[in-house]
């Protein structure tokens, strides 16, 4: 007997190029089922995935993201569509009982397909962003069932001009498909245009009645004390008789330690005509003071489990549906002060600091594990919004699930871009896809797929463009707000809000319209190049209230370059000086192919890497690039935060990550190693933040929370390269109001007598009563007209450190707590926030000339001491985790979650860190946690 429910078909798939298969789909699923053998052309398939992903998995082609290997892979424009038309085949078992019904579900296929089940053919219509459900009840076998699909690429894969370009020749825009696949200024072309069964395939077994696309909506009254849950679901009766059934809804809240409380249980009786469909709306369910869902930085992400079941008389449970749901309300208007779009969550304004997202992987190798890491990384950076760019995907439910979990609001665009749809060079087609009804069908289906996620904040018609007029008008109508979400009132005359397609979120026609950029669609987003850090704070930097795209550099660490390129890609750029004194960087061919963006902008910005001296090699270049990365992105967010609500309502960085091994605009690379910009962003976007305005040199406190800060003070200390503290000051603050920026006082050290050319500044915001640090911010600065070249000899300083590490292993996961203490001393006034390490951990063993270790096996505790006779700042320290067993050149274990990284410690200061990661499968030795820094060029082990 088949159990009621869903079975995912994600293993056992094989594939072959259609031109190399001599039999048809009927034969494949009856008399001639294929198998992998030395004589056949069949291979293990990546499902979900793409043709290119399958070929890479089987090493039939090189890794397109390594070096220049993509140039060795045949492009569909040269081969024709048949070359990337593939058969996919698998077997499944499903024994059903009388009055059970079985459906075969495809959550997405690119671009069209014919499906064969046990010799029966079904034509699947076109479109990359639509679901397909096939009733296979009457064609199933009691034992093994054979399933084959022939999947065809997009109808208009286009060609790639020699110069590349934004979306190639723009032909892909004639289809309802992802547009980035023809290449952009940040990615190479994807040779198969993402052809494949790229999302979940499943078999679902139900009784006579099945549940289709429930819609959950919450409304609030009395200042969020009273709430109602509105639910509408479509019910389909597959049987040939009128069916009486009960529809049950259960709402469960998790209290703690896995203990759950059923908050509501409601049953309603319905009659469904034979082979008919009805839309059933539940009586609204009342809640008193529900636990609200909040975005990252505003509160907890409280979720309730909503379970809907349908029980058919004389049959039993027929179907069930479950969805985590967050009670929250999103409002969005154009702000009267700034002209920017303002968002409110549960009545509170939220200052948007987020970034643009393309997709997790350019070959659509999507997984829950990768999505979890991607989204947690964004939360770790203290971001609160992700924009799903219109040239990419309608993101998957797993993406949204983790945005729900970690509190990331999502701006979801439909599949229109200015470059491809009317504003490109050469001028592209302004009429969008050829089939407008197909576009709208995919859009409506996407809304139904995603609308129950609390993280989903708004729909947008396109990137830097609006959809064609008829599509745009249809979307405006389909996605119109229910009256409650416009007037805040719910009348008995109003229809239930859950009967709308959405009705709860705004639809904005394009990314530069209606409160974004100049609001009129002119190209007023950007810029996308390196900037002087102080410029981000200037009132003249950006005119408008909300910038949907502003970007900069994105160089990863040297280990990533070596892991993703052969040795000829390890050469650093040439620095060519022009007649105007500006430096032009000339990268090698591989870096250019991987879309490297230079750290100079001749005529505007002097090379920021050369501010630290000419790099000697790849390691030196990448380390200095990380220094620039940290400053650049911290300044970007701090500059916007400095004018919160007075000039700006939000900003989204272009872009957060790369779906391939690109070298442009990223906080972490495709291998999932964070750059220093990740931690610069994390610092700048913390909910309560102390910062230095780099334009005015005023110390500021940014309070984005709803709570007033009182009984707080700021400690400012300057440290020179000799380890002295020539400046120390405590600023007493009476209060910092909620949702406000408070300018405290001018930082006057640069105007003092004989200030140092290069110096360090440490700011700490703390509560006076208990000295608890609320915000810590460390700067390295130079006087006007100077640079950071004095930091080069500072590398020779031997600053002593003491590192204490305590590790806990749960399954394959390691959870480490590490304390790093700069044990050097300097003459300074008493540090009111200074933390001292007081543990005495016994016998030491010498490991290196500067490093000694002790361990307590009973407590899982390890202590490492780095010897040093110099006093000063331990500068720009970085953790990394390594596999001691691997023979690969790249020994890193990735991903790793660090509570902070790329940090510096002043004399006498200590900081604690949390490090979390999963050990690789089969690894027997303990992983090694390493530490290195500006003063510690040779990384040393602190654990393992």
Swiss-Prot record:
EC class, as a word, reads hydrolase
Q: What is its EC number?
A: 3.2.1.152
One GO BP on record is: carbohydrate metabolic process
PROSITE patterns, sorted: GLYCOSYL_HYDROL_F2_2
Q: Where is the active site?
A: 464 (proton donor), 549 (nucleophile)
Pfam families, alphabetically? Glyco_hydro_2, Glyco_hydro_2_C, Glyco_hydro_2_N2, Ig_GlcNase, Mannosidase_ig
Mind telling me which SUPFAM superfamilies this protein's record contains?
Answer: (Trans)glycosidases, beta-Galactosidase/glucuronidase domain, Galactose-binding domain-like
Result after altering residue 549 to A: Loss of activity in vitro
Q: Which GO terms describe its molecular function?
A: mannosylglycoprotein endo-beta-mannosidase activity
According to the record's subunit comment, the protein's assembly and interactions are:
Heterotrimer of 31 kDa, 28 kDa and 42 kDa subunits.
What does this gene product do? Answer: Glycosidase that specifically hydrolyzes the Man-beta-1,4-GlcNAc linkage in the trimannosyl core structure of N-glycans. Does not hydrolyzes pyridylamino derivatives sugar chains containing Man-alpha-1,3-Man-beta or Xylose-beta-1,2-Man-beta.
For this chain, the family text in UniProt reads:
Belongs to the glycosyl hydrolase 2 family.
Q: What is this protein called?
A: Mannosylglycoprotein endo-beta-mannosidase
Q: What is the organism of origin for this protein?
A: Arabidopsis thaliana (Mouse-ear cress)
């Amino acid at each position: 007997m088949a159990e009621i429910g869903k079975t995912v078909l994600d293993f056992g798939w094989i594939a072959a190029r259609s031109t190399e298969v001599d039999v048809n789909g009927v034969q494949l699923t009856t008399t001639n089922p294929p198998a992998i053998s030395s004589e056949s052309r069949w291979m293990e398939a990546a499902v979900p995935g793409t043709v290119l992903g399958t070929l890479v998995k089987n090493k039939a082609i090189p890794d397109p993201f390594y070096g220049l290997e993509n140039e060795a892979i045949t492009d569909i424009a040269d081969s024709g569509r048949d070359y990337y038309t593939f058969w996919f085949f698998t077997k499944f078992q499903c024994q059903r009982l009388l009055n059970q019904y079985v459906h075969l579900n495809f959550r997405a296929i690119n671009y069209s397909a014919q499906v064969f089940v046990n010799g029966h053919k079904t034509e699947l219509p076109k479109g990359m962003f639509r679901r397909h459900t096939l009733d296979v009840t009457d064609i199933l076998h009691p034992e093994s069932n054979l399933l084959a699909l022939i999947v065809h690429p997009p109808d208009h894969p286009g060609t790639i001009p020699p110069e590349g370009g934004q979306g190639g020749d723009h032909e892909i825009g004639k289809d309802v498909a992802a547009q980035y696949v023809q290449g952009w200024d940040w990615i190479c072309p994807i040779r198969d245009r993402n052809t494949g069964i790229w999302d979940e395939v499943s078999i679902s077994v139900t009784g006579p009645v099945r549940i289709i696309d429930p819609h959950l909506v919450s409304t609030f009254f009395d200042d969020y004390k009273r709430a109602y849950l509105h639910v509408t679901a479509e019910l389909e009766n597959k049987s040939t008789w009128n069916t009486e059934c009960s529809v049950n809804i259960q709402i469960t809240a998790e209290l703690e330690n896995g203990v759950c409380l059923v908050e509501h249980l409601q049953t309603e009786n319905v009659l469904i005509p034979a082979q008919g469909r009805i839309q059933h709306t539940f009586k609204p369910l009342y809640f008193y003071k529900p636990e609200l869902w909040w975005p990252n930085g505003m509160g907890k992400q409280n979720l309730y489990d909503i379970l809907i079941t349908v029980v058919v008389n004389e049959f039993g449970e027929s179907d069930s549906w479950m969805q985590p749901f967050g009670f929250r309300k999103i409002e969005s208007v154009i702000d009267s002060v700034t002209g920017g779009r303002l968002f409110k969550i549960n009545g509170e304004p939220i200052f948007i600091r987020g970034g643009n997202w393309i997709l997790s992987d350019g070959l659509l190798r999507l997984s829950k594990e990768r999505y979890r890491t991607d989204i947690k990384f964004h939360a770790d950076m203290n971001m609160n919004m992700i924009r799903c760019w219109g040239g990419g995907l309608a993101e998957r439910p797993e993406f949204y699930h983790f945005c729900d979990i970690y509190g990331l609001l999502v701006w979801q665009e439909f599949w229109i871009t200015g470059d491809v749809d009317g504003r490109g060079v050469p001028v592209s087609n302004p009429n969008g896809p050829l089939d407008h009804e197909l576009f709208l069908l995919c859009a409506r289906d996407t809304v139904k797929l995603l609308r129950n996620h609390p993280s989903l904040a708004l729909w947008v018609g396109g990137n830097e463009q609006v959809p064609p007029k008829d599509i745009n008008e249809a979307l405006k109508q389909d996605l119109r707000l229910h009256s409650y979400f416009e007037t805040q009132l719910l009348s008995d005359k109003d229809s239930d809000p859950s009967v709308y397609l959405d009705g709860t979120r705004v639809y904005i026609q394009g990314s530069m319209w209606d409160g974004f950029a100049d609001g009129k669609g002119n190209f007023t987003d950007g810029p996308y190049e390196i900037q002087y850090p102080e410029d981000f704070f200037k009132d003249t930097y950006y005119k408008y209230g909300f910038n949907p795209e502003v970007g900069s550099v994105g160089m990863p660490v040297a280990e990533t370059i070596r892991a993703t390129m052969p040795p000829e890609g390890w050469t650093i750029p040439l620095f060519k000086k022009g007649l105007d004194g500006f430096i032009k960087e000339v990268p090698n061919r591989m870096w250019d192919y991987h879309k490297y963006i230079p750290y100079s902008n001749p005529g505007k910005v002097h090379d920021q890497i050369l501010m630290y001296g000419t790099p000697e090699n790849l390691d030196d270049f990448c380390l200095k690039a990380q220094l620039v990365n940290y400053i650049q992105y911290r300044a970007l967010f701090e500059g916007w935060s400095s004018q919160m609500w007075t000039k700006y309502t939000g900003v989204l960085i272009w872009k957060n990550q790369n779906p391939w091994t690109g070298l442009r605009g990223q906080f972490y690379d495709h291998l999932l190693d964070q750059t220093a910009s990740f931690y610069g962003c994390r610092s700048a976007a913390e909910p309560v933040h102390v910062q230095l305005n780099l334009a005015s040199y005023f110390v500021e406190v940014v309070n984005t929370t709803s709570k007033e800060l009182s009984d707080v003070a700021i400690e400012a200390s300057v440290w020179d390269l000799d380890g002295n503290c020539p400046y120390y000051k405590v600023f007493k603050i009476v209060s910092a109001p909620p949702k406000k920026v408070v300018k405290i006082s001018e930082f006057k050290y640069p105007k003092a007598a004989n200030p140092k050319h290069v110096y360090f500044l440490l700011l700490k915001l703390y509560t006076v009563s208990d000295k608890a640090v609320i915000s810590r911010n460390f700067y390295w600065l130079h006087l006007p007209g100077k640079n950071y070249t004095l930091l080069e000899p500072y590398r020779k300083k031997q600053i002593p450190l003491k590192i204490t590490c305590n590790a806990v292993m749960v399954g394959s996961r390691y959870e480490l707590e590490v304390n790093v203490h700069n044990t050097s001393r300097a003459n300074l006034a008493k540090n009111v926030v200074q933390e001292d390490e007081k543990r005495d951990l016994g016998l030491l063993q010498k490991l290196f000339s500067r490093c000694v270790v002790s361990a307590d096996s009973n407590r899982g505790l390890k202590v490492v001491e780095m010897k040093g006779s110099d006093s000063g700042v331990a500068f720009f320290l970085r953790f990394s985790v390594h596999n001691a067993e691997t023979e690969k050149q790249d020994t890193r274990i990735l991903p790793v979650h660090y509570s902070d990284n790329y940090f510096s410690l002043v004399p006498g200061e200590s900081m604690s860190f949390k490090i979390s990661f999963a050990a690789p499968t089969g690894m027997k030795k303990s992983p090694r946690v390493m530490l290195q820094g500006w003063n510690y060029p040779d990384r040393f082990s602190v654990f393992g």
